[in-house]
Amino acid sequence: MRLWLCWLGCYTLLLWALRRRMWAGPARYLRSPLSRSLYANMMGSHGPPAPGAGENHQWYVCNTEQLSESLQPIFVQSYLDQGTQIFLNNSIEKSGWLFIQLYHSFVSSIFSLFMSRTSINGLLGRGSMFVFSPEQFQRLLKINPEWKSHRLLDLGAGDGEVTKVMSPHFEEIYATELSETMIWQLQKKKYRVLGINEWQNTGFQYDVISCLNLLDRCDQPLTVLKDTRSVLEPTRGRVILALVLPFHPYVENVGGKWEKPSEVLEIKGHTWEEQVNSLPEVFGKAGFAIEAFTRLPYLCEGDMYNDYYVLDDAVFVLKPV
């Protein structure tokens, strides 16, 4: 209770200080993002569009001339579609929920002393990710909306929001996750959560395995790739895999500390296209070939400082060889 009263007092002082600054000039002179957010909410304004909102088409641009000859014909051009725009609109709206954002910021600062950021997000139910819309998923896999298969395994599924995009196509949905709070979110969605050392030893195979933005955040990415190959249905099975490029692998530990992984993927080059060119060899060592790939934005819900966050993803469909 004392902690809450202390926080409330600090917040009141912040409002008082902000009010004094407002008398000195309009909102454009408020340099702090928090101050601008407070001002906009108090004035009933949603503020200007998010910076760079008019440049969203750049998220999908690939210079195909810089791709190797074998990769050029299997590149799938993607675009900003309705599903992506809905996520962006919802994220922008949530970032304007001032008191909720302040509460999230306060809780995060306390819990970060003994919890990872991922677990904090799972506890608060915030920070959902977006990799692809249902239409983008179907186009990449070359399936129609009515297509059905048996088993899906989503490795590192987080809160299950991306799993939800794929789940209508499968009879059984399995997921893995390290964070206990994210496991709780997955169980609320009725997904079958398997242990980190359990999914490789279930005795059955999966028709589709998704590994979305996991390899750059796990300790043994090569082992994950090889284990994925061993439990994939050998003829019709497919892996849908996303990597943030440029590739910067780190593993998050309790307390938000980041460490280098014990296994290294030999991804070469500097640009998005150069690193994509080196990936057929990486996947080949694990028994996969690239069937199709695209460039998509890896989006995350924002906070009081940004409407949303975005990284550059390369999303691959891999087939066993």
UniProtKB/Swiss-Prot annotation:
GO terms for cellular component: endoplasmic reticulum; mitochondrion. Disulfide bonds: none annotated. InterPro entries: METL9, SAM-dependent_MTases_sf. Keywords: Endoplasmic reticulum, Glycoprotein, Methyltransferase, Mitochondrion, Signal, Transferase. It comes from the Eukaryota. Gene3D superfamilies: Vaccinia Virus protein VP39 (3.40.50.150). S-adenosyl-L-homocysteine binds at E177, N213, Y298. Glycans are attached at N89. It catalyses: L-histidyl-[protein] + S-adenosyl-L-methionine = N(pros)-methyl-L-histidyl-[protein] + S-adenosyl-L-homocysteine + H(+). One of its GO terms (biological process) is methylation. Its EC number is 2.1.1.-. Protein-histidine N-methyltransferase that specifically catalyzes 1-methylhistidine (pros-methylhistidine) methylation of target proteins. Mediates methylation of proteins with a His-x-His (HxH) motif (where 'x' is preferably a small amino acid); 1-methylhistidine modification may affect the binding of zinc and other metals to its target proteins. Belongs to the METTL9 family. This is Protein-L-histidine N-pros-methyltransferase. It comes from Gallus gallus (Chicken). The lineage of its organism: Eukaryota, Metazoa, Chordata, Craniata, Vertebrata. The gene is METTL9.
